Amino acid sequence: MSLHFNSIGFLLVVLALLGVLGNNSSITISATVLLLMQQTFLSKYIPVMEKYGLNIGVIILTIGVLSPIVAGKVKIPALTELLHWKMFLSLVVGMLVAWLAGRGVSLMGSQPVLLTGLLIGTILGVGLLGGIPVGPLIAAGILSLLLGKV
């Protein structure tokens, strides 16, 4: 019996451990699910996840963001509130973040190796700086601006 080192499996284990240490359940769960998929009969579904996973994730995230509105916990602002400078600024920032996330998706598609650094940076930001793990796409968008890519 020969042992074979699986670098992708090792990376997934490291990401899962960093997720645990950084209290980042989304990284921990994602890395663990992908590791289980890679090591079992579920590996045949990895191309499906690769092709549709990001879109499915964005749909689920959008449902989560819209749910408080549908539940009546967040009210739709009146027209006069839409004209307030803070509301205008929030619209501009929302558009900027969406644009950055779009650049991030393009960069991650063209240079997926950078995703590892972004994920580790996100985990370190959560663990060391008390941040919240919401921004790999936006981080990739900012990185694309810094690199002058996409």
Curated annotation (Swiss-Prot):
Compartment list: Cell membrane
Membrane topology: Multi-pass membrane protein
Transmembrane spans: 1-21, 52-72, 82-102, 123-143
Superkingdom of source: Bacteria
Swiss-Prot/TrEMBL keywords: Cell membrane, Membrane, Transmembrane, Transmembrane helix
InterPro entries named among the record's database cross-references: UPF0756_TM
Pfam families from the UniProt entry: DUF441
Stated family: Belongs to the UPF0756 family.
Full protein name: UPF0756 membrane protein Asuc_1151
Organism from which the protein derives: Actinobacillus succinogenes (strain ATCC 55618 / DSM 22257 / CCUG 43843 / 130Z)
Lineage, top ranks: Bacteria, Pseudomonadati, Pseudomonadota, Gammaproteobacteria, Pasteurellales
